């Protein structure tokens, strides 16, 4: 078991700032319906460095069901057609939307692509008029994660130590 400091963040209205400028030629963000193999491939590429394993522990049928839900939105950042990151939301179309996974493939980090992906994805989710978008982040996440979330308009509302399996 491992103890992690978990920070819960939320936003209750869309960020009023202008949309972020595309940081690289050929960068685009789009809602994609990924099959489970494509999803797991991107999930691993983004998540292995920060020890994501939630989706890897799911039964294949459960993952397929989750990916097929109309309330599951996965925004994929592509650079020159190559998948470079993802931003996954659950509960789109409901009052509370959870930002479940967000991150970049390590080769694409450090180029301002993360804030661009998050901004584009949040704008798309806010077009569905939720009352709140929330997430949790922890000490295993990328060191820049909380500052990226804060600049996107998310504010911390709770912190606590939680115990997770190794």
Walk through the language-model features, giving the residues of each.
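Conserved beta-strand-loop-alpha-helix junction that forms the acyl-donor binding cleft
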Residues: 109, 135-145, 157, 162-166
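Short amphipathic alpha-helix that is part of the acyltransferase structural core
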Residues: 23-55
